[in-house]
Amino acid sequence: MSLNGTLKALTDPIRRNILTMLKGKKMIAGDIAEELGISPASLSYHLNLLKKNDLVIESKEKNYVYYELNTTLFDELIMWLKQF
């Protein structure tokens, strides 16, 4: 886990909204973009940054690509923060 990259990814409100939407469920990119009211290109940028920092996991099922939270990373981040 790159703490700097993770924290930087969390600074953007759109990315935080994406993470909130993915809390407890998988979603496809089109549904995320539509719900947020952003372009597919903009969503792709944000999802790539979230994936690069291991905050989101991508999985393929049939003809769809689903995105979901990487809860393991959040557990590690919480444990690290509890040190202080």
Predicted region positions:
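Conserved segment of winged-helix/HTH DNA-binding domains
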Residues: L3, V65-F84
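Short, Lys/Arg-enriched N-terminal segment that forms or immediately precedes the first helix
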Residues: M1-L7
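Helix-turn-helix DNA-binding motif, specifically the short coil turn and the N-cap/start of the second
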Residues: I28, S39-S42
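Alpha-helical residues within the helix-turn-helix
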Residues: E34, Y45, K51-K52
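Short capping segments at the starts of secondary-structure elements
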Residues: P13, G24-G30
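Beta-hairpin "wing" of winged helix-turn-helix
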Residues: K51-E61, E68
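Pre-recognition alpha-helix immediately N-terminal to the DNA-recognition helix
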Residues: R16-T20
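Residues within the alpha-helical elements of helix-turn-helix
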Residues: M21, E35
